[in-house]
Amino acid sequence: MQYSPYVYYNEHCIVFNGEHTPMVINDSTFRKLFDFISQFPHYIIGSNADLPIVGGSILTHEHFQGGRYSFALNRAEVERKFTVNGFDDVECGIVKWPMSVVRLTGKNKDSIISLSSHILKSWRAYTDTKVGIFAETDGEIHNTITPIAFTKDGKFVIDLVLRNNITSEEHPLGVFHPHANLHHIKKENIGLIEVMGLAVLPSRLKDEMAILKDAILNHRDISAIPEILSLIHISEPTRPY
């Protein structure tokens, strides 16, 4: 384990697998998350998904990110509860959140891990053509999970964020990803930290905002500023601000 040089939040740490192995989401992943918070109950720990677009920037080596911080997702409430047969000791619910999040809570971490694996297996195979969700196309898997584990009120908690990385001709960077009209803000992966409610924006925005600030304060037509057009990739003239 080491602390991140980026320090996106308090005590931002990265936990690496001692062996060089690629990112994967499975039963072992859930067990590792709970092993960590069993030793460090004051920390939160999560894993990026194991697929491109919905995963982190590094998929070639297994790692986790944690810290001593309460994210907006951790504080979000459950808006609908449900039960799963055979898991009476696990509280289940859908979190009130912009993404699809299943929250499992209980004192028996083995039960939570087993149910997490069951949900993962079910989601991997899930298809709903009405909303454009396909489990796989041409042998390529699209469904995975971004898991986040923590403790609350003496209980173990895991948030399972359902992800799908399918692309289309209209949305080549992902159907369930910021679309082209938002790419001037961010088109990079939406990873673990963003999923939990903390925006990690590209550093280029700092330069872009400085140019825009100068243009706005001086009442300049941004469509006449080449630097702005190249930075935000506008292909058509923009109306004066």
Question: What do the predicted segments below correspond to?
Answer:
Residues 59-69:
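Histidine-centered catalytic micro-motifs
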Residues 222, 227-231:
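An amphipathic alpha-helical core segment
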Residues 219-220, 239:
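Accessory, solvent-exposed terminal regions and/or long lumenal/extracellular loops of proteins
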Residues 51-59:
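Short, conserved secondary-structure transition motifs
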Residues 1, 60, 82-83:
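Conserved alpha/beta core surface patches that mediate binding of polyanionic ligands
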